[in-house]
A protein has these predicted regions:
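Class I (Rossmann-like) S-adenosyl-L-methionine-dependent methyltransferase catalytic domain
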Residues: 1-45, 63-70, 74-77, 81-134
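A conserved beta-strand element that flanks and buttresses the S-adenosyl-L-methionine
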Residues: 55
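Hydrophobic adenine-recognition pocket in adenosine-nucleotide-binding enzymes
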Residues: 59
Length: 134
């Protein structure tokens, strides 16, 4: 519904967003009308190098590992070296078990070192961090 875009606009940032949900776009915050696009991270509807920054917070876990790599490469395409991606992760088998009980919709999640392989495969040069049990 554009909450993050609205917050960024409030800071004076020229922000845009995408959502897979037409409902979210139809019921978005009034301040972000025209700044949200229907789409997904696999094929971002923006030209190469069109942004000074890109962010994805706990969203790409809805994709398979292979498609996570595709989505990450798309983010790199529109803002090379200027991204921040937060992914879901865990450090121990116990944390993994708790994660799997809590996040029911995640398709791909893994240990940090496995996520690092995904970022490397995507040739991602931005920043990343993971949400975990620590």
């Amino acid at each position: 519904k554009g909450f993050l875009v609205k917050d960024m606009l409030g800071l004076g940032i020229d922000a845009y967003g995408i959502d897979v949900s037409e409902y979210a776009l139809m019921h978005c915050e009034p301040e972000v009308v025209g700044r949200l696009h229907i789409g997904n991270a696999l094929s971002l509807p923006f030209p190469d190098k069109s942004f000074q920054a890109v962010t994805s917070i706990n969203t790409i876990h809805n994709l398979s590992r292979e498609l996570c790599s595709t989505a990450i490469a798309e983010m790199e395409r529109i803002a090379p070296g200027k991204g921040f991606i937060q992914v879901d992760s865990y450090n121990t088998p116990k944390e993994k078990e708790l994660f799997e009980q809590w996040v029911l919709t995640a398709v791909y999640h893994d240990y940090p070192w496995e996520w690092e392989k995904v970022f490397k495969t995507a040739r991602y040069t931005g920043d990343w961090y993971w949400t975990n049990g620590n």
